[in-house]
């Protein structure tokens, strides 16, 4: 996990430093118009490419997708450096900047989908997202600062070279992550069209009510973020009269607030109310913006924008964790690719809408509307957020049973949570048959309480106790039950249906290998502590 966090730090610092260098170069070449055109082109290219690039994270080993993204960016940035030193036409550097943006869209979805496979518990997953959000907050103000210092001392070409080296360092760190069977096996995949692959992320979000809600609230937040990117300039120049330097101070306040938000988000580790935390983060993202219009005092505004930064970190940590725990692993990167694209589009839309609000309502009116939007959106959604928290609570005993199973033990913590939520409690009386030899199998069973006896061709071969499991042979080999399992006394079982069992076990290499090992032992012995069923 440490390697992926360090790689993310190198990537985010390099991205922001490079972005500053491109903006300054564009301004020197063509003024504000060039800056706007280049920025729009980079944003548009990334928004279009993101859902397509995210397919890679679900088809291939996510580590190597991230490495490929880093290497591609390093090559394009090195090309920009060569173009700069060769006095090539500015269009060459602009095109390369667009290619860097496109290449970057594969990195974040693959990273967001890889982290759950490295986290062993829900708490570790939340902690990893806290670290990622903290690193991003640092990168947002440290990256431009580094880029600015290098620009002042050495020029854009050197910034390009340094940021290209940062991408290479990120790639090296990721390449050192040990391979888990998270890597995809292309031979076992069913051939599908690119369109089907592309739409899988959209379909997953559309099908799951909780994911629609989360993505919708994320979109509302980034829409207001886009408006704030315009409004913050007006706040500095008109309301506070701090000049152009004030724009930087106000943006820094948000970044510093994000660091304090990381401390608040650290308290989320282990909490069972992350959807409520997400809603609180959305709420406090908006309210301070409206309050700026009420009392435009410089110190007060800095504090308010720091609160926005706190809300931003809480939203990022809780929202990312909820999505990682909600989406199936096989489409997780594409879900984040869709999210990335939607967020880019809503940020741009917010930036377009803000000038119209300013012309229509004036500065204070625009601030009140922008700040009120998020509370007005999240308050009606509060019952649904609470419902997400209620349904997300998984009894610890179910997770413990899954972790104790040799088949499920290798699975990522987020996948285990999803399986625990899919378990169905089954009770049986003494002498009642759970499965019968020769019948089709459609469930896998974990024993919570009681004792069961296993019969093969009418002969008692084994007894099962709490913590044992049975039923995987019929599911994985698609054969009839190989044994009869009967309750010796009253028993309590947890049943997992075929669809959930196969999706989890066959989609994760270590789990499939463990299952095949168990099957080999069962079919090879039929006795000695392992049941054939």
Residue ranges and their predicted role:
Residues 375-408, 516, 524, 531-533:
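Membrane-interfacial segments at transmembrane helix termini in multi-pass membrane proteins
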Residues 163, 366, 467, 485, ...:
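Residue-level signature of catalytic and energy-coupling elements of molecular machines
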Residues 1-389:
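Alpha-helical transmembrane-bundle signature of multi-pass membrane transport and export proteins
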Residues 398-477, 481-483, 503, 532-533:
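Regulatory nucleotide-sensing modules
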Residues 96, 304, 412-421, 516, ...:
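Short, well-structured alpha-helical segments
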Residues 478-499, 510:
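Ligand-binding loop in jelly-roll beta-barrel domains
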